[in-house]
């Protein structure tokens, strides 16, 4: 399982921990990922994702999972999230 957010693409970063004496130690900065179940209003079902906590705030800010995926760039989304996005857009187009 990769350490990458399914919705924002946030992943592991590398860098240095720098002490007061300017001693540098290489380290990995891991994203704060959690397994969540989000509800799609359009599909009327639950969808499981592994997302960063910051992504949860972004989903709520944009007005829910459906609105977030509609505006999200496909390059940032995981394959599963892209499939859900296509389902949502297809169902919205059929309803219109």
UniProtKB/Swiss-Prot annotation:
GO terms for biological process: translation. SUPFAM superfamilies: L28p-like. Keywords: Ribonucleoprotein, Ribosomal protein. Gene3D superfamilies: Ribosomal protein L28/L24. The keyword Ribosomal protein applies. InterPro entries: Ribosomal_bL28, Ribosomal_bL28/bL31-like_sf, Ribosomal_bL28_bact-type, Ribosomal_bL28_sf. It comes from the Bacteria. GO terms for molecular function: structural constituent of ribosome. Pfam families: Ribosomal_L28 (PF00830). Signal peptide: none annotated. GO terms for cellular component: cytosolic large ribosomal subunit. Belongs to the bacterial ribosomal protein bL28 family. HAMAP family: Ribosomal_bL28. This is Large ribosomal subunit protein bL28.
């Amino acid at each position: 399982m990769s350490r990458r957010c399914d919705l924002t693409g946030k992943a592991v970063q590398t860098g240095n921990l720098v002490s007061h004496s300017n001693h540098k130690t290489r380290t990995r900065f891991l994203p704060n990922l959690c397994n969540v179940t989000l509800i799609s209003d359009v599909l009327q079902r639950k969808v499981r994702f592994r997302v960063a906590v910051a992504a949860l705030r972004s989903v709520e800010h944009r007005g829910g999972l459906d609105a977030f995926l509609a505006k999200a760039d496909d390059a940032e989304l995981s394959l599963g999230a892209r499939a859900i996005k296509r389902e949502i857009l297809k169902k919205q187009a059929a309803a219109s």
